[in-house]
Structure formats: structure tokens, C-alpha cells
Amino acid sequence: MVALLPGLAALLAGCNEDTVEKQIGSATAASVEATYRVNRDPLLNDWNQDVGRTLTAFSVRQQVPYKFKVVDTDMVNAFAAPWGYVYVTQGFLDFADSEDEVVAVLGHEIGHVVHRDGIKAFKQSILFNLAAGLIGSQSETLGEVTAVGLGLLSLHYSREQEYAADDTGTAMAYAAGYDPQGLLGFFAKLHTDLEKGQSSSYLEALLSTHPYTPNRRDRQAAQPWVMAATAPSAMRIAQGYLGRGQYGRALALLNAKAAQEPDNQQLALMLADALAGRGSESEARGRYQMASAQGAPSYPNYALAQMTKNPVPVSVPPTAGEQAQALALVGSAEALVTGTQDTQTRLAAAQEAMAPKLQAARGDSAAAMGLLQRLSEVETELPKQTQKIAININAAVAAAADVVYTLDRCQEQSVTAVQNNAEVGRQATVLLRSLSQGGSRSGALKLAQSAVYELGKSNELLLAASEAARAAVGPTQEAQMSARQTSMYVERLFDRQRVRQSDLTLAQMLTRETRERAQAANKQAQEAQNRARLATVRGMLAVLQLAHAAAPAEMLPGLDRMVAHYLRTGTGQVAALRDRGFGYGDIAVMVAAARGSGTAIGLEADRMGAGIAPLEVVDLKRDGSNGLKVMVKFLSKAMAQEVALPGQASNPAG
């Protein structure tokens, strides 16, 4: 076990456990934020903080001032420092498919805080001494500061601690009105990756510190609140879906229980609310009237009055001019589908050509990253000079590994994006054909045309990202080779009997070289990743525009509510912009731009003007594009579950 520094022993003297945890947590948080850039996008951070506050309202440790932040690394991870500092990585947000997945994982990390797992793990590690040095102002280098933050990512939790955190995470998600099956969805993604037998590099940290096993998934699947086994549990989750404008998801849950409890009036009223939200006015009225006649008229009568006051819109068939324009655009959409297939072929060929060098880089990175685990599990107190050098090596090797994570994520993201573009292109073609024959509704043409345009721009960006990635592979491989060579000196540093001054000098020189190579490679890898990320955003904007076009007019008020939830704005604001002719994808860009610049959303709308692709006008900074990608991903996936897209066999929301 690590021997405590004299300064730490003095620090702990007379302190209660909360005081120690608070001081260690504060020092660790400072280390994390010195190591990784914190995302400052207002839209993303408001959402992250809102979700965190909603969950921690159900924490049994209310004395902890929880804070939630996003850090900029393509590594897939989420972690909690002592005293409620909860971090998710940009890579994790890119990897997660839904808001419910993120909520459940955030709840899991809050569970580690609730059970004090972080401080327990720190006490088993050299990091406890390092954090104490920060508290006592004994730190002399940035390396010492960053080591604690990097070390936090390599702390290991026991199987029992992971089980308990899973329980807390799903229970909190359920209590907050989210679907706790989000954790099962996240586990399913991990399981799929592991089944491939080639776990991606960017998952290594998550799988190392939070070991996944099928038992974790099966254990949560057996929890009654996770599977909505009873009417009350289904109703609680459905209420959350109603509040987020996901009326189809709510209906699916409620319909499954309605036959079991036909006399449950609260369930019947929630069903009516869900039907009203989806624009099924006649059926909703019938259920409200039935509930009113059964002796509880107050709410049903209010709901009926609101429906009379705010009737649902009625779809108007496309005009003859719109039909003719749609027919003319079918050829463009078909050409887009062919072009997307060509893009897929070119991306696959480029990735195959890069594979040998990238695989070699992964191997060198994996070997070098063994240092992180070595540092977290060391059971001896190192001399101060040796400790500092080991810390700096740790930081340099981690920086080099980050470049591999970035290129791996760029490739994965590009493959997924081009596959989605191909499917959305086919759906746009089907919708345009329908419009040309008098199907769909008036106003859908402009939205479908916008979707085709965004898909074309997305394909262009994917090819540019591929070219940038190709240029980054060589520098990335050089950085990993340097990191591996540097890490070879770790064993000598930990052996106090063998270490010589010449070893320390050489280790410092190699560390400097690794850091410089990592910085150069990272600059090129980030260029590729930023293009792939923007390509993904444009593909998702196409989904939103197409879903808006495909939705019957009566569904639009309900979809306004969904958009407002994810964009953290008012339903009335969304409806007003929609009435001005903007699509849901347009509105997402406007809101992100307004939040990032501090201007009014209406002013952004005036500046952009109807008919102009917003991303051709808006210059989103890096944070803004990352935040927009996350929120648009969750929104587009939720909307695609509500709206039957053209060419889709059936509406998955029911």
C-alpha cells in the first residue's frame, strides 16, 4: 500500500471524511481541467447541467455540490472525481445513441459519488499522494497537475462497486422520468463491439476502468423499474416521454398496460394526453369524454377546452406547381443516392489503405498505455524527482494515445455517416416521388429539397475528412512509436535500485519528443475529425428536414415540443419559426448559433432568411459544432421514432 506523505498525514489529521473528499475532489477536478479542454458550448452545457440536476435531486448525498462537464477527448469515457465532479467525454457523447443512454451512465457515475467509490480508489493509489501535493501547493510542474486528472481515468472499480453504481444509475433515471433501459442500450453497444473481437482503441479506457460483463446487463434487465413491469412503473417512464414530446414512445408503454388495468383512470388520461400530442384528436377527445363521464371531470374538461381552443393543423395537399418541381427533383435525389454509394466505396478503399499503419499505431499505443495502469496500481513511494518524471511520461503517452482515439473515431463516424446518408437519400427519393403524385402535403417540397442539399454537402465533407485522415496516419504512427519507446523507461523508474541519473535525463528527452510528436499529429487528426463531425451534423440535419416534411400537419405541434426540449428553448419559439417556413434542422442551427453568440433566436432567423442553408451562413466555433452534433443526434433519432419516414416499413413508435 502507498505510504502517505507527511503533508498528507497532516492534512488528514482531525478532518472528517467529507472534508478530505472535498479537498481531494477539488484538486482532482483542477487536474482534469488542466489536462483536457472543457467544452464551453452553452447549448450542450445547459442540457448536461439540467440532466445532472434532475438526477441528483434523487441522490441520498444532498450535501455534495454536483457539477457536470464535458471534456474534449475522443476517448469514450465517463468518470466522477470525489465530491461530485462528474465528467463525460466528447467521445462518449458521440458514441451514445440516445439521451436515455447518457442519463443512465450519468446516474451510474453519480452512484460512484454516492458510494464514495472514487475516494476509496484514490486511497489505494499513488494519486492520493499527488493530489495531496496539489492541495498543499507542493506542485511545481504542469505534469504533476495533469497526472492526477489522467490517473482518475485509470482508477479501477470492483465488480460490486459497478453493480451498485448500475443500480443507482437506473433507479435515478427511473425516478427522474427517463427510461432506465438506456443503460441496457449502452451495454448492447459495448457488447456488439466486444463480439466483433476487435474493441476499438477509444473504448479501452472505459472497458478498463468500468469492466463490462453480460452479468451487468442481465442484472439490470431483471430490475422491475428497468423493464417497466408494472403499470405504475410504465406510467412514470411514459410521463417523462410526454414531457419531452415523445408521444409515440409514451403510447407504446401505456397501451401495453391498458389492457391489464382497464379501470386505471390515471393511465387512461395519460393515454389521452399521448394521443392528443400525436395529433390523434378524435380518439383523444373520446378518451377525455369517457374519463369525464366516469366522475373525474376537472382535468378532462380542461383538456377538451384546450383542444377546442387550439385545434390541430390540417394537412393541405401539394399544389400542382409543387408536384411538378418534386418530379424534376427526383432525378437529383437518385443521383445523390448513386453518389453516396460511390462515396462509400471510396471511403472503404481509403480506410483499407490506411489500415496497416493505423493498426501498428494502435499496437504501439496499447503497449505504451500500460503505463497508466502501472501508475494507478503502484505500491511504493517514489523519490520526488522520479515521481515527477513518471508523471510527465504519463501525460505525454496519454496525449499520443488521444491521437489514435481521434483517428479511430473519425473512421467509425465516417462509416456510420455515409451509411445513414445512403438510407436518408433513398427516403428523400421516395418522398419526392410521392409529392410528384399528389401525396404528402404542401410545404414538404422545400424541406425535402433542403434534405437532399445537406446530404450532398455531408458526402463532400466525408471525402475531405478521409483525405485529412490519410495525411494524419504517418505522424500518428510516429507519435505512438515515440510513446512506446518512452514508456520502456517506466520499469527502470519504478526500480529504485537500478535507476540512474542518465536514465532520468534520457526519459525527460524522450518525453519531450513524444509530447511534440503527439501535438503535431493531433493537429492533423483533429482536422479530419472536425470534418467528419460536421459531415455527421449535416446528415442529421437532413434527417430532421425530411422527418419534418414527412410528418402529417396534425403532428407538428407535438414535434415542436420535442424540438424545444432538445434545443432548450420554448415550444412557442419553435412553432413561430416553423410558421415562418423554417425546417426543424434549420431551427436547430439557429438556436445553437444564437446560444453561442448570445443573440436572440429571432435575429439569427432574420439574418439567415428562409431558403438559405443555415450552415452556409453560420460560423459555428468548434464547441458549437460539437454541441450541435450531440443535440441534433438525439433529436433526429427521437423524431425518426415518432414519424414514419418515407420507405420505412412502419412507425417504430407505434
Annotate each predicted stretch with a short phrase.
Residues 245-246, 279, 321, 363, ...:
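Short helix-adjacent coil turns
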